[in-house]
């Protein structure tokens, strides 16, 4: 692992943990390094994981749960002498879940995790790179879009490709969709992990890309959808 990729687990430790779990039993949770859910939503996610029996890897970035402009937008990466940006961490969850869960703070070997046979689902913000990686490796996606084109990517996953779902919530007293709670999250995870058709479709679609993605398709949603449509005909 490169020295500038700070984390509390090495790649080998992550691999060995995955090796100890049944095939398709682990959900991988990562929201990227820029914008994630709020602190309150992270707490609901932690409750959902605590109360379930689900194996999971949860990646938490420095500054998670904070509002405002991410530090990655403001300039060069901080040096080793600078303090890490503090953020949300599910205190005590690792003790409660024991070996059922792996909570990674900092950088995670995403391709290693997604490509491992024990990984059976990906709870994702639906960022473009993460979405493409999951599609290419045949991993079903549970979308938690947060901004911009992530919502389009979530619809692509759920409605067009049919290789996953988007978390849904009920309606609040004001008639607008409310924030996700632990029950919404738990229901979405359970649905994703047990849906045989979604898993079969994800594996089937990944075989179309065993030779790789065209560059234009990786870089642009429109080109990718067009490429998918051509493959389907």
Where do the language-model regions lie?
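Catalytic core of nucleotide-sugar-dependent glycosyltransferases
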Residues: 1-233
